[in-house]
Swiss-Prot record:
It is an enzyme of class 1 (oxidoreductase). Belongs to the iron/ascorbate-dependent oxidoreductase family. The keyword Aminoacyl-tRNA synthetase does not apply. Binds 1 Fe cation per subunit. This is Flavonol synthase/flavanone 3-hydroxylase. One of its GO terms (molecular function) is L-ascorbic acid binding. It is found in: Cytoplasm. GO terms for cellular component: cytoplasm. It comes from Eustoma exaltatum subsp. russellianum (Bluebells). The gene is FLS. The keyword Disulfide bond does not apply. Residues 196-295 form the Fe2OG dioxygenase domain. GO terms for biological process: coumarin biosynthetic process; response to molecule of fungal origin. Its EC number is 1.14.11.9, 1.14.20.6.
Length: 334
């Protein structure tokens, strides 16, 4: 059965100035109704080049407790490396449809990798206005080049270079999260799988939408340990804070860091997995490049023992990551 891609629907919808019913959110979810207007939140910005490591640790820890999201600048990844990553991803989504379908997710596949549209069980049959491409970029043993675009030819080099540079940033983030709770520096990285941690790249492609007031990405928390995201220049992130949805402002050349479910679990609830969603734009294509830092499927994740005691009993079960992911994607209780 042929799957209709959002990119194709967008080009048809442009002509008739409407969108199919399955992309229209329920009234209480629609961005025009559910968003606090006139207020743009300044997501915390943390300078990773600061010579005072204690200060960085304090800022990362505070942002992870209060927000579950922050931006990092002077992170050590050259702007040119990020620009190339964006360039080759944009090029892929501009290819003819039949060429993109060559690396489509096989029907019935249990793997998340490949080009696709529908990701998980949609709430009330509603769909997100987005196409995507998933593939693993690290470690080498986890990579399946079958799902990496052959076109543009520079795609592989750009992604491998970004993966190489990202590792140091990720290691430091895990260290700061650990030190922020008075743990050993490797506590969070080891708890999430250590050197077997999987780096899963996703490219989100949100085409222009004739009715951005009606469509939304699905509100969710990330099931990863942490997510490190590169946005394009079109804003569209909303964060749920203090009972309301707010638009968030990015700053140029920053990486956006989301605390995911596995860090919330390991921290026994001290750090918060950020509840977020995306809006779409009438005129412009929005793209983003999140990398999900995921435990290996059989790795067990649970609260770090040092954070559990009589006053603070375990708030989460310890379970294999693949079992957690299955429950999350199928909307089953954990």
């Amino acid at each position: 059965m042929e799957v209709q891609r959002v990119q194709e629907i967008a080009s048809l919808s442009k002509v008739i100035d409407t969108i199919p019913a399955e992309y229209i959110r329920s009234e209480n979810e629609q961005p025009v109704i559910s968003t606090v207007h006139g207020v743009v939140l300044e997501v915390p910005v943390i300078d990773l080049s600061d010579s005072d490591e204690k200060k960085i640790v304090g800022l990362v820890s505070e942002a992870s407790k209060e927000w579950g999201i922050f931006q990092v600048v002077n992170h050590g990844i050259p702007n040119e490396v990020i620009r190339k990553l964006q360039e080759v991803g944009k090029h892929f989504f501009e290819l003819p449809q039949e060429e993109k379908e060559l690396i489509a997710k096989p029907e019935g596949s249990q793997s998340i990798e490949g080009y696709g549209t529908r990701l998980q069980k949609e709430v009330d049959g509603k769909k997100g206005w987005v196409d995507h491409l998933f593939h693993k970029i690290w470690p080498p043993s986890a990579i399946n080049y079958q799902f990496w675009p052959k076109n543009p030819p520079a795609y592989r080099e750009a992604n491998e270079e970004y993966a190489k540079r990202l590792q140091l940033v990720v290691d430091n983030l895990f260290k700061y999260l650990s030190l922020g709770l008075d743990l050993e520096p490797n506590s969070f990285k080891d708890g999430a799988g250590g050197d077997d941690l999987v780096y899963l790249m996703k490219i989100n492609y949100y085409p222009p939408c004739p009715r951005p007031d009606l469509a939304l990405g699905v509100a969710h928390t990330d099931m990863s340990a942490i997510t490190v995201l590169v946005p394009n220049e079109v804003p569209g992130l909303q964060v749920y804070k203090d009972g309301h949805w707010y638009d968030c402002k990015y700053i140029p050349n920053a990486l956006i860091v989301h605390i995911g479910d596995q860090v919330e679990i390991m921290s026994n609830g001290k750090y918060k997995s950020v509840y977020h969603r995306t809006t779409v734009n009438k005129e412009k294509t929005r793209m983003s490049w999140p990398v999900f830092l995921e435990p290996p499927p059989d790795h067990e994740v649970g609260p770090i023992p040092k954070l559990v005691n009589e006053e603070n009993p375990a708030k989460f079960k310890t379970k294999k990551y693949k079992d957690y992911a299955y429950c999350k994607l199928n909307k089953l209780p954990q």
